[in-house]
């Protein structure tokens, strides 16, 4: 399996990713193949517009029941709404993954120039 070079986020979340405020994302197994130490391009899900680049720090298993306030804060959504959204996106899936990342240094410079 090849190493992913892109990741998408809902457009409403991309300002948080691009500012470095959002540093995790919760995905299912099909989207868990990111590799720590790699850099990936961030695109909006809706329009495929490139937003920035992030460096993958970790990919760790996460059970649905382990989703907590920290995850909700990172997703900029209340915990009950986050759990409902995850169930909508990944119905009947308990085995999830939390991908931890940071804004790539070159991305922050480019964003400040805009």
UniProtKB/Swiss-Prot annotation:
GO CC terms in record: cytosol
Annotated Gene3D superfamilies: Hypothetical protein
Residues forming the catalytic site: 22 (proton acceptor), 25 (nucleophile), 75 (proton donor)
Pfam families per UniProt: ASCH
Catalytic activity of the protein: N(4)-acetylcytidine + H2O = cytidine + acetate + H(+); N(4)-acetyl-2'-deoxycytidine + H2O = 2'-deoxycytidine + acetate + H(+); N(4)-acetylcytosine + H2O = cytosine + acetate + H(+)
SMART domains listed in its UniProt record: ASCH
UniProt keyword Hydrolase, yes or no: yes
Domain ASCH: 8-93
Molecular function terms, GO-annotated: hydrolase activity, acting on carbon-nitrogen (but not peptide) bonds, in linear amidines; N4-acetylcytidine amidohydrolase activity
Keywords: Hydrolase
EC numbers: 3.5.1.135
Disulphide connectivity of cysteines: none
NCBIfam families per the UniProt record, alphabetical: PRK04980.1 (NF003443)
Function: Catalyzes the hydrolysis of N(4)-acetylcytidine (ac4C).
Record-stated family: Belongs to the N(4)-acetylcytidine amidohydrolase family.
Protein name per UniProt: N(4)-acetylcytidine amidohydrolase
Organism: Vibrio cholerae serotype O1 (strain ATCC 39541 / Classical Ogawa 395 / O395)
Highest classification ranks of the organism: Bacteria, Pseudomonadati, Pseudomonadota, Gammaproteobacteria, Vibrionales
């Amino acid at each position: 399996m090849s190493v992913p070079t892109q990741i998408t986020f809902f457009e409403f979340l991309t300002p948080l990713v691009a500012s470095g405020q959002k540093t995790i994302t919760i995905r299912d197994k099909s989207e868990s193949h990111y590799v720590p130490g790699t850099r990936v391009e961030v695109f909006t899900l809706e329009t495929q517009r490139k937003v920035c680049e992030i460096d993958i720090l970790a990919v760790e298993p996460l059970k649905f029941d382990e989703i907590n306030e920290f995850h909700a804060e990172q997703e900029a959504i209340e915990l009950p709404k986050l759990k409902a959204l995850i169930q909508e996106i990944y119905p009947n899936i308990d085995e999830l993954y939390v991908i931890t990342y940071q804004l790539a240094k070159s991305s922050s410079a480019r964003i400040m120039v805009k």
